Amino acid sequence: MMSTKRWVLIGAASAVVLVALVVGALVMSTGAGRGSAASSAAPTTVVVVFAMAGEDGVQAAQLVAAVDVATGAFELRETSATVSIPGTSYSRLRDAYPFGGAQAVAAALGGGSIAAGTGWVDVSQEAWQRLLASGVDVTIPEAFQTFDDVAERYSDFEVGVQHVAVEDLRGLVNGVAYLAPDSRQTILNALAKASLRAMASATPSQGVLTSLTTEQWTGFAKALAKN
């Protein structure tokens, strides 16, 4: 009987090349390391960007969540949405990441500049994997399989609740792009919820870059813990 699973090849053969992981220290200072200084006013919304190598081998914004600082509630932003990225020919939100990280993504969401009352958090691929080192429970609505021919890693995602090991995180993130919109949204919502909850206990050694001050981060982390 023919399998109904979707196969996704991740790696050199499909132009998805695992590039060097970005290692960065947590910067708890206003606008540090990403260009323009952030507003002195405490943000009411924080754009959290989780990065991972995309199909062209370049780090991209794979998961973008706009988080309410007061409640910790979040709304995912469509990473394939059309935006303006100054100085480039790229037009998808996810592609803003190489041109300034989470700050560039937040600016793209704001139509070219970061909206008033908005902060940002930049979670690199390595930092994301570290946050979810113990894996994550996700409900898989649609079965699919991935094979990373660079890392030589095969990942099998069955329908139902599944504990996804951190070694399969890249396969999950890249594979969901080929699923039906509803299936993709279900998986990304669960992944965002778990990732934000894990970030609530992040420490400076975990490689997260942010525009928030130390005091603002403390309050934000408390809100994230509600997820």
Feature-to-residue mapping (PLM):
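Non-catalytic, solvent-exposed segments at the cell envelope interface
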Residues: T4-S14, A25-N227
